């Protein structure tokens, strides 16, 4: 088979199963409204949960820092790219979340890949929730360790897998809030089981940090759990981009030596780090608390309204509210029907989610108003097939 034939066959297979992904060009993609092709839509696809991407204080912080530092970092943090802005943000994050150290990464994907591939060795085992993010599962597959996946949120299955003999170390991998289902992991029980088997715990709290817990400290803080490795990302609740790993002093020093994504990548712009510090200040403030309370009320309003519909609603109380429709083509038709009525929603299909669970992944944000939720519900009730 030629290279071109391989490419063509893969694309043909995706088209045949209605799983071909595409990008949409937008002129505004975050906030209450999405603007595409000159038309304005209510935006139910954004991860900007607290509406901070449009916050004037954060925008101003980025602009001022760009004037001071320039628009790029100039290199890896190991060479010339670790600025006072990066250092300040790392120290603020560590203090906020109660860890000795925080290390910044350019993305959550890079952070997960770096930590797992740096830590895991040939005789080790990774035990991951089977619905873990692609960055976690891909990192596990790329590492020399054995990967075992436990049934979603099934702590008994997790315990059985950890009990089987392992010559090396074991790492349990889970998420705080699951990106496609919107539900939360039983973190306290998972941590208890991991410690009983002398395993370390890695929690990716991309969709919980900033949005849940006291001062927005996330799902782990809310549940009284402190994993050995906590990954937080900044493209959701923080409204910016990037990520950080929270860990011990020695693990941070280890990652600075062996995490290749950290060593060999240009660090985030200092202006971005400064904007993230400003975002953290908003998250921790009374304004941040009010934004979280408003979002929680909107989620409750949506769930109360959709319960009477024909759609299957998962047990999700986060900003992520997936409506399971099952069939790929039906999910695409439903997303298009909503867009025709002025509501932008995204159809999620395999391989992102398991076969037979295609869905509309609706995300609510603090930027929405109650009337927006009511409009979405009205359109959904009229769009069922």
UniProtKB/Swiss-Prot annotation:
**InterPro entries in UniProt:** Aminotrans_II_pyridoxalP_BS, Aminotransferase_I/II_large, AON_synthase_class-II, AONS_Archaea/Proteobacteria, AONS_Proteobacteria, PyrdxlP-dep_Trfase, PyrdxlP-dep_Trfase_major, PyrdxlP-dep_Trfase_small
Q: Which CDD domains match?
A: KBL_like (cd06454)
The entry's keywords: Biotin biosynthesis, Pyridoxal phosphate, Transferase
* Reaction(s) catalysed by this chain's protein: 6-carboxyhexanoyl-[ACP] + L-alanine + H(+) = (8S)-8-amino-7-oxononanoate + holo-[ACP] + CO2
Pathway assignment reads:
Cofactor biosynthesis; biotin biosynthesis
Q: Which GO terms describe its biological process?
A: biotin biosynthetic process
Which positions bear N6-(pyridoxal phosphate)lysine?
Answer: 236
Gene3D superfamilies listed in its UniProt record: Aspartate Aminotransferase, domain 1, Type I PLP-dependent aspartate aminotransferase-like (Major domain)
UniProt EC number = 2.3.1.47
Homology family: Belongs to the class-II pyridoxal-phosphate-dependent aminotransferase family. BioF subfamily.
* The protein's role, per its UniProt record: Catalyzes the decarboxylative condensation of pimeloyl-[acyl-carrier protein] and L-alanine to produce 8-amino-7-oxononanoate (AON), [acyl-carrier protein], and carbon dioxide.
Quaternary structure note: Homodimer.
Query: What is this protein's name?
Result: 8-amino-7-oxononanoate synthase
| The species this protein was found in | Salmonella enteritidis PT4 (strain P125109)
